[in-house]
Amino acid sequence: MKQFLSFLLLFPLMVWSQSDYGKAEKLFEAGKYDQARPVFESFLKENPSHLKTMEYLGDIAGHQKSWDKAIVYYKKLKQLKPSEANYYFKYGGVLGMKAKESNKFAALGMIGEVKESFEKAIELNPKHIEARWALVMIYIQLPGIVGGSETKAIKYSNELLKLSLVDGYLSRGQIDEHFKRYTAAEQQYKKAIAAGSTKTGGQMLSNLYKNKMNKSVKKN
């Protein structure tokens, strides 16, 4: 009986907490991160191992370019649930952004861990498309002397092609465009559009024409 009465006393608080949490999730989805963050932070103080809340806070920190904060959240998530591919992907992503904004020497010390994080995400989820995209972009953007490799970029692009025609064509187009093979890139983007990527493929093709080939997109 005492336990039942205690439950009744706590019930309004539980409902209120769930209501607040739901509102915070809607604020997050609407991109109102400053309003959502305090609710998630308060909830996490009372539930320090709540994975979803930790992920929300990591995502908010990432959106706000607070790389160090995001790194802390995702690192903790990896420790709490080392089998979740997305935690490694997100950790690698924010670590990569920190590296990009750091000086060259500091960045070099992070690149290895960034790659390993994306590779781990693929190991845990062999169909992880975003991690392969990240590796494609890393390998074409890095100079060869510090680990860049067109061969490895093509390897991951080919893997993408097996998972998704659109992502395979678009990623190969990005590789060709980066190495100034503009006609080849044009063909890859057109293949992506034909495969269904009318928006992203169309935008990439338009940017290629405008910035690299001095052409206009033909209207049907």
Residue ranges and their predicted role:
Residues 15-56, 62, 218:
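N-terminal leader/linker segments that initiate helical-solenoid repeat arrays
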Residues 27, 61, 95, 102, ...:
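Residue at a conserved register position within TPR or TPR-like alpha-solenoid repeats
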Residues 47, 81, 118, 125, ...:
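A structural motif in tetratricopeptide-repeat
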Residues 50, 84, 128, 165-167, ...:
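Residue-level recognition of tetratricopeptide repeat
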Residues 52, 56-59, 90-93, 134, ...:
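Canonical tetratricopeptide repeat
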